[in-house]
Amino acid sequence: MSISIETLEGLQRRVTITVAADKIEAAYKEQLKGYAKNARVDGFRKGKVPHAIIEQRFGLAARQDVLSDEMQRAFFDAVIAEKINLAGRPTFTPNNYQPGQEFSFTATFEVFPEVELKGLENIEVEKPVVEITEADLDKMIDVLRKQQATWAESQAAAQAEDRVVIDFVGSVDGEEFEGGKATDFTLAMGQDRMIPGFEEGIVGHKAGEQFDIDVTFPEEYHAENLKGKAAKFAITLKKVENIVLPELTEEFVKKFGSAKTVEDLRAEIKKNMQRELKNAVTARVKNQVINGLIAQNEIEVPAAAVAEEVDVLRRQAVQRFGGKPEMAAQLPAELFEADAKRRVQVGLLLSTVIGTNELKVDEKRVEETIAEIASAYEQPAEVVAHYAKNRQLTENIRNVVLEEQAVEVVLAKAKVTEKATSFDEVMAQQAQG
């Protein structure tokens, strides 16, 4: 077998492979034997059909099978022999072939780029340094109290975090618009559910009052006919309610986890906050490292690899929204191409870090990661056992750990500055992605 490789545009390659005639003929004879064993021809018993008749009837199909199989086999032998870093499926083109002669064909394909990492020392990373304060804990406690809150009717003027019951009618240029009217609408204020200016216009008014609110719909508002439009809402304020938070008693505490005292609850909450904070800081640092890697190492990515990643993202999107699997192909590829390209870039760069530094998965760290995940559940031992039984779940954690190890290698060479940051700020940035 002879092999010649041409470099085409970008990452495209074309290989020409020639297979010896005797190898093709030997495979052809074996293929005919297979046909002969199962062929049914009138006048002959199964398996007893003369060779000449078998060849006459099935020779063309047998040769086509042989040539197709040989292209696959010879190509992947060439990939191994030439150490080709194949990306995606090849396109085969057979040359003219005559029985008894050697067989040649071409295969066009893409390869992954050869990546040589550079500029790691130029990557800048800002690492948040956070101390969870008593005030942070108090806020979390208040969140739990609000989940168990009750409401008491008030005759006082409405405040920013009150709950109100209103009737309203909205109009633009004096004309009511669709969806702008409601009766006995309950609004818990302070949650940014309404357009800017709406809740602020209610603050200061008492139950029984009627008044107008002037607002402007945001330019990004979902209804095309209302974007950027000035509107007036006629409001009837029917009821104002103040929030009543439960006292921090043992009875209240027992509603959350295994805590028995307020001190236990605070300790449990702090532990959860520390876990969330660690994950958020790790994710933020990793994102900066990856952004830096991409900025310092512009690499061309194979279109085939991007297309495969697009398909993965399509399927994930359909699954996330509960659609049928066949819907994935209907989603426009351009919706996912930027993310797909980035994922391929990240995969190539981190793989290069791993290979260059001969990194191996830290198995102890895998166990610690699984234990940390399990600690968030009521029965952590059962979660650990579930991972132990599920090879794919464990493999996912191993991949995450290996990526973290790669990020740490880059981080050790990068310019890292620490910045004092609040817990709320870090978590808000995490929520924004």
UniProtKB/Swiss-Prot annotation:
Keyword GTP-binding (UniProt): no
Statement: the UniProt record of this protein carries the keyword Membrane: no
Its EC number(s): 5.2.1.8
Reactions accelerated catalytically: [protein]-peptidylproline (omega=180) = [protein]-peptidylproline (omega=0)
Subcellular locations according to the entry: Cytoplasm
HAMAP family registered for this protein in UniProt: Trigger_factor_Tig (MF_00303)
Protein name (Swiss-Prot/TrEMBL): Trigger factor
Organism listed in the record: Actinobacillus pleuropneumoniae serotype 5b (strain L20)
Taxon lineage: Bacteria, Pseudomonadati, Pseudomonadota, Gammaproteobacteria, Pasteurellales
